[in-house]
Amino acid sequence: MSEFWLCFNCCIAEQPQPKRRRRIDRSMIGEPTNFVHTAHVGSGDLFSGMNSVSSIQNQMQSKGGYGGGMPANVQMQLVDTKAG
């Protein structure tokens, strides 16, 4: 007795290859457009208290471009993470 194998390609769906994300390197990234430096905030500026945060926000708003926001009251808890 002999064996007979018949393959129906129409019945077997080919699995699509997973799409690989294109790797981005430095040459693909251009210069910033419409960039305006309005303020510099260092890590120590935020640890000096909420009054400092308010003054930074006021300084940035005085430079323009921040008029579309809505005022909101925010309460934050400061957690000191000094390495012992």
From Swiss-Prot:
Disulfide bonds: none annotated. One of its GO terms (biological process) is regulation of cell shape. The modification Phosphoserine is found at residues 43, 52. The keyword Cytoplasm applies. It is found in: Cytoplasm, Cytoskeleton; Cell membrane; Cell projection, Phagocytic cup. Coiled coil: none annotated. It is a lipid-anchor. Keywords: Cell membrane, Cell projection, Cell shape, Cytoplasm, Cytoskeleton, Lipoprotein, Membrane, Palmitate, Phagocytosis, Phosphoprotein. GO terms for cellular component: cell projection; cytoplasm; cytoskeleton; phagocytic cup; plasma membrane. InterPro entries: CRIB_dom, CRIB_dom_sf, SPEC. Its main location: cytoplasm. GO terms for molecular function: signaling adaptor activity; small GTPase binding. Widely expressed. Expressed at higher level in T-lymphocytes. Highly expressed in CCRF-CEM T-lymphocytes, Jurkat T-lymphocytes, and Raji B-lymphocytes compared (at protein level). Residues 29-42 form the CRIB domain. A lipid is attached at residues 10-11 (S-palmitoyl cysteine). Probably involved in the organization of the actin cytoskeleton by acting downstream of CDC42, inducing actin filament assembly. Alters CDC42-induced cell shape changes. In activated T-cells, may play a role in CDC42-mediated F-actin accumulation at the immunological synapse. May play a role in early contractile events in phagocytosis in macrophages. The CRIB domain mediates interaction with CDC42. Belongs to the CDC42SE/SPEC family. CDC42SE2 is mapped in the genomic region associated with schizophrenia. Interacts with CDC42 (in GTP-bound form). Interacts weakly with RAC1 and not at all with RHOA. This is CDC42 small effector protein 2. It comes from Homo sapiens. The lineage of its organism: Eukaryota, Metazoa, Chordata, Craniata, Vertebrata. The gene is CDC42SE2.
